[in-house]
Amino acid sequence: MKEMCMHYKSRLTEEMADIKAYMDMSCELKKSGNDLEAQILKDIAKDESTHAKHLIHILEKNDYNMEDTENALHVMLAEYKL
């Protein structure tokens, strides 16, 4: 199970990076007037945030302290208004 949890932690890092990348692209598209494309990328970022929350939950169930990561995710989501 430890190996699987390490995979989940790695995946969580990737999910958080993906959220940032999608939101950065969304902001750039919005500035260019591409509102539909910007909204699509924002929706994808929301999906990624759901995945990240699920991974945090799984890791917490396996006795990993994810408080700092969970707080960082909440700050990121608030910053992007997701």
Predicted stretch roles:
Residues 1-82:
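Non-heme di-metal
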